[in-house]
Amino acid sequence: MMTDLKQSHSVRLNDGPFMPVLGFGTYAPDHTPKSQAAEATKVAIDVGFRHIDSAYLYQNEEEVGQAIWEKIADGTVKREEIFYTIKLWATFFRAELVHPALERSLKKLGPDYVDLFIIHVPFAMKPGKELLPKDASGEIILETVELCDTWEALEKCKEAGLTRSIGVSNFNHKLLELILNKPGLKYKPTCNQVECHPYLNQSKLLEFCKSKDIVLVAYSALGSQRDPQWVDPDCPHLLEEPILKSIAKKHSGSPGQVALRYQLQRGVVVLAKSFSQERIKENFQIFDFELTPEDMKAIDGLNRNLRYDKLQFAANHPYFPFSEEY
C-alpha cells in the first residue's frame, strides 16, 4: 500500500474499493453509555472522518449505524462516501453461522451492505448468545473451527453483495498464509487489523502484509483505553512517552497526533478512538504536517514489543496468534 498523503487520504484495497487511511474506532468499555458511541460517531463524521470501524463485540452497532444514517439524512455525507467496517465475532465462526451473523448486523445498522467484513480474532468460541461463553469455573469456552471454512463463508457474503470487501484481524503471518494458501481461494484478505503503536510497531508483520498486497490497519494506535477486562492497568501510557512529547512540541501538535501520523507515513491505515469532541477533532488534524526521517527513526526506536491486548485466555488454542514473532 502506498498513498500520497498530500493528494489522497485513501488507499486502494486489493479487490478494488478505496479505504480512507484514517478511521474512527467505536469500541467503548461496558460502563460507557451506548448513546455516547452515537454522539461521538456524529462528531467524527462532522469533523471529516469517513471510515467508521465497528464490531458485534462492541454491542453498539445499532447506535453507530443510527448516527451514520442521521448524518446521511441531514446531507453531511452520502452513503457511498462512508467506509463502514464490522467484524464477525468468535461465537459465529462455524460456516453456517457467518451469513446470519452478518445479516443480523445489517438489520441493526440499516444499510443493505457494509464496506468491510472481517474475522475479529482467529480462534472460535462456543456458539450461543453469550459474547464470552464460560464454563462452571469461569474459563472462556473455546472451540476449533477451521479458519478456511470460515473464510469461505465470508467469500460467499461478498459474492452475495452483503459486503464489498473481506479481511481479518489479529492474525499473524502464519495464519494469513493459511488463508492465502487455501485451495480454491477466491478472494484474499484485503486487510489485517492488529494492535499497532510505537511500543509495538509490527514492522515484520507490516513488511509481510505489504508483500502480499494486504493493508495493515492499526488499532490501539494511541495506546489503549485500558479496559481492565482486556488490558493490564500497569502497562505504561504511550502518550506520556517523552520522545513523542518532544516530537509533538516541535510540530506544535500532540503526542497522539504524532503517533497517528507515524502510522500513515509507514503505509499503515490507522484507527483513532475517542469519545471526546476536542480529541476527535485533534485526531483528524494529521494531514497538515509531516514527520521528518529523524522523527520516524526516533519513533521506530521506541518499539519494545509491548502488547496491551494479550488475549491470554486463548493462549492454548491452536490458532492463538501471539506465540509467533509476527
From Swiss-Prot:
Its main location: cytoplasm. It comes from the Eukaryota. NADP(+) binds at residues 25-27, 53, 169-170, 193, 271-283. The record marks 87 as: Lowers pKa of active site Tyr. It holds the Pfam family Aldo_ket_red. It is found in: Cytoplasm. Keywords: Cytoplasm, NADP, Oxidoreductase. Its EC number is 1.1.1.-. Substrate binds at residue 120. This is Aldo-keto reductase family 1 member C8. It comes from Homo sapiens. The lineage of its organism: Eukaryota, Metazoa, Chordata, Craniata, Vertebrata. The gene is AKR1C8.
